[in-house]
């Protein structure tokens, strides 16, 4: 290996292998440990096939693709035989799959082949098994997500399939979340919000199609007891409207008053907690609202065995080109910068001089906003341009500005009421974005 320290800037450094020194790690004290998990093979083998759609061809300035966030997996006893089956969502052009458990084996469900074929034209972003019509079996909510469809497409309506008790499904023929909202759904959760004995729904909008940076809305759908849902967001939770780009949510009785409260997270969002006051959800103003991240997942469990459930929230992580803090946040400026009727989101970082610079390179910006080519004819003219050099201050003042001040996957320990304390966790949890979290006593040590 070759070690160089305190290297000066503006120079070419030449390394030669013959000048390197021998170096090896000392593993003498390392003890072999028995793996906690072993690889297993479930047959039949289900392979997820992603569509060829490329988000960047439509929106040049986004930092990741929202059309390929699947597949999602969940489990539930679909056919009433007291064994948990596996459900796997699908990309556009493919059908969702159910693996029916039979003892130690699985077989691919064939009963619902025709009705699942009707779902091929949607990007199935989530499958929620729950008893919608109170008949004792699990029905299936299929959410339609991604950005591949037109905002006018009927395929953006979510679908509710009702179970006949034998694992055979029929379409409820409901337009969900309602007839006026064709959305790209990111998450759906069930819970008895109004304590009337049936399961109601929260549906979260992942993204405004073609308008990355515009906040989406959450929807509260109330069950009439027979599996018919009505959108009552305006009456029950108006503050869910335009709340953000929602990725996950959870119902939990945080204050132990017998009512399910709601937690909602997403991109450029704080951790939003809504107290269920019986007839209305009211947003809680606490420190978690200031924890603005690129949140992907929320998991609730009692980590310290104090009888109170804590929060584990999956974020982007700290192992990428992006950095964010409260003193130097990532900012997204959203506006129709070129006045063509379509908005653009410009993602920026704050430099040491306090100015915001776009992450996008000159050619990416010009691909999205053609008028900038005249202003910046070459890379030399662009290399020191901050956001105020690129766009007039007037249009920046009119822009929606969203920020991110933490990229850490985080644990928040429940205190009293709606208060939580953030604790440090191992650095390994920050090596990649976290999209799914589970908790269990995997090592059989009692916690």
Question: Which residues does each PLM region occupy?
Answer:
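Acidic/hydrophobic-patterned starts of short beta strands in beta-sheet-rich repeat architectures
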Residues: 80-90, 134-143, 195-204, 256-265, ...
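Short, solvent-exposed loop/turn segments at conserved positions within beta-propeller repeat blades
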Residues: 91-94, 150-156, 210-216, 267-269, ...
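Repeat-solenoid scaffold signature
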Residues: 1-7, 286-360, 446
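Extended acidic/polar, glycine-enriched regions
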Residues: 2-26
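Blade-edge motifs of beta-propeller repeat domains
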Residues: 20-68, 100-122, 159-183, 215, ...
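Beta-propeller domains
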Residues: 87-107
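Hydrophobic or amphipathic alpha-helical targeting/insertion segments
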Residues: 129-163, 189-191, 195, 199
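Beta-propeller blade termini
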Residues: 69-80, 123-134, 162, 176-177, ...
């Amino acid at each position: 290996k070759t070690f160089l320290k305190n290297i000066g800037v503006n120079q070419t450094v030449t390394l030669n292998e013959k000048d390197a020194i021998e170096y090896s790690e000392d593993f003498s004290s390392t003890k072999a440990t028995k793996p906690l998990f072993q690889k297993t093979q479930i047959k039949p083998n289900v392979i997820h096939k992603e569509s060829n759609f490329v988000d960047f061809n439509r929106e040049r300035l986004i930092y990741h693709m929202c059309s390929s966030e699947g597949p999602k997996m969940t489990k539930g006893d679909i056919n009433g035989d007291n064994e948990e089956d596996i459900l796997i969502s699908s990309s556009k052009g493919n059908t969702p799959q159910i693996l029916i458990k039979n003892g130690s084996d699985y077989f691919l469900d064939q009963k619902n082949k025709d009705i699942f074929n009707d779902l091929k034209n949607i990007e199935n972003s989530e499958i929620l098994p729950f008893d919608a019509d109170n008949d004792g079996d699990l029905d299936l909510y299929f959410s339609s997500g991604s950005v591949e469809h037109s905002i006018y497409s009927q395929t953006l309506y979510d679908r509710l399939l009702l179970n006949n008790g034998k694992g055979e499904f029929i379409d409820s023929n409901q337009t969900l979340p309602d007839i006026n909202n064709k959305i790209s759904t990111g998450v759906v959760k069930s819970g008895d919000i109004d304590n009337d004995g049936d399961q109601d729904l929260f549906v979260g909008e992942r993204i405004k199609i073609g308008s990355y940076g515009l906040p989406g809305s959450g929807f509260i759908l109330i069950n009439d007891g027979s599996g018919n849902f009505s959108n009552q967001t305006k009456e029950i939770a108006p503050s869910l409207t335009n709340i953000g780009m929602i990725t996950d949510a959870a119902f939990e009785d945080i204050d132990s008053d017998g009512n399910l409260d709601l937690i909602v997270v997403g991109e450029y969002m704080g951790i939003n907690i809504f107290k269920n006051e019986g007839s209305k959800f009211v947003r809680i103003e606490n420190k978690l609202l200031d924890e603005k991240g690129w949140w992907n997942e929320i998991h609730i469990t009692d980590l310290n065995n104090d009888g109170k459930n804590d929060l584990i929230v999956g974020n982007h992580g700290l192992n990428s080109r992006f950095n964010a803090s409260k003193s130097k946040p990532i900012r997204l400026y959203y506006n129709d910068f070129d006045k063509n009727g379509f908005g653009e989101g410009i993602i920026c970082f704050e430099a040491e001089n306090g100015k915001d610079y776009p992450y996008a390179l000159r050619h990416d910006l010009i691909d999205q906003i053609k008028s900038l080519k005249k202003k910046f004819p070459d890379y030399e003219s662009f290399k020191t341009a901050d956001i105020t050099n690129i766009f007039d201050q007037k249009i920046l003042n009119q822009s929606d500005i969203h920020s991110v001040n933490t990229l850490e996957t985080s644990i928040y320990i429940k205190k009293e009421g709606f208060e939580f304390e953030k604790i440090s966790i191992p650095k390994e949890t920050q090596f990649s974005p976290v999209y799914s979290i589970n908790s269990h006593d995997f090592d059989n040590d009692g916690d």
